[in-house]
Amino acid sequence: MIKIAYNQHLYNHPLPEGHRFPMIKYDLIPEQLLHTGDISREQLFEPEDEPEEVFLRVHEPSYLGRLKKGEVSAREERRFGFPWSQRLLEREVNICSGTLQCGLYALEYGAALNVAGGTHHAFPDRGEGFCILNDIAVGARYMLDEGYVNSVLCVDLDVHQGNGTAFIFEGDDHFYNFSMHGRSNFPFKKEQNDMDVALPDNYAEEAYLKDLAFFLEESFNAARPDMIFFQSGVDILECDKLGKLNVSPKGIKARDEMVIKKASRLGLPLVAVMGGGYSENIAKIVDAHCNTFKTVMSYY
C-alpha cells in the first residue's frame, strides 16, 4: 500500500489574509484524491515527530536552538516568507518527519508521498523562500546514515533551484542532486549541484521535455542510485505567477511520468514531495499535484 504523509492539524498553517503562499492546497490535495477515489484513508498517515538528533545531522545546533526559543529576527521572518510562531516550527518538524518516514515506507512498499515537503531552500543555519527546515536533506541523510541505502538521487524539478539541498550535500559522493530550474528565477545566487540545467524564461514545453529526457538519463547513469527523492514542484506551470516557464498541465503530467516510470522500471524506491506552485487559480495547482499522486499509484 502506497503511504501518504499528511497532518490535518498542521500542514495547512494559518497565514495573514492576502498572503501569496497557497497554504490551503495541503488540505485540498488529499480531499480531492479521496473524493475521486484515487486514494483511500488507509493510505494516509500522520507523521510522528522525529527526535532532535535527526535534525542535527543536517541543521546547525545554534539555528535549531534559536528556532526552539523563538529567537527569530524580523529579517529572518522576511527571508522565511512566513510570520514566525512556535506552531510554524511544529509544522516544519512534522513535515520533515513525514518525508523521512516516507523513505522508510518507500523501502517497504516501493513508493511514498508527502502532501507537503520539498523545502529545498533551507540551509544548515538558515531558511528562506518558504523553507525553514530541509525535509529532503533530513530524509536522505537519515536513509544514508542508517545504511538503508548507499546512494540517493534527488530529482528536483521545481522551477526554483534547490540551493539549500545543493549546499548541504556539496562534495557528498552518496547524494546526487539533479536540478532543472529557471535561470532568472529565485534564488538569484545559485549553488552548485551535481547536475544543473538552467532554463531561460518562457522556455517551450517541447524543449523542456526533450531536455528532461536527456538529463534525467544522464543523472541516473551518473548517480547509480538506490533511492529517488522527487521534488515535484508544479510552479513550472504556464499559469504560475512566479514560474516564468511555459509548461501545460499535460506537460507536467508527462514530466512526472518520465521520472516515476524510470524509477519504477529500475525497481527503485521513490519518495515524492510536492514543492512549489503559485498559480492564481488554486484548482490548477491542486490538479497538477494530484496528478503526481495518480502517476505514482499507476507505476507502483
PLM ranges: what are they?
Residues 1-137:
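Metal-dependent C-N hydrolase catalytic cores
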Residues 74-300:
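A general "terminal functional-core" signal
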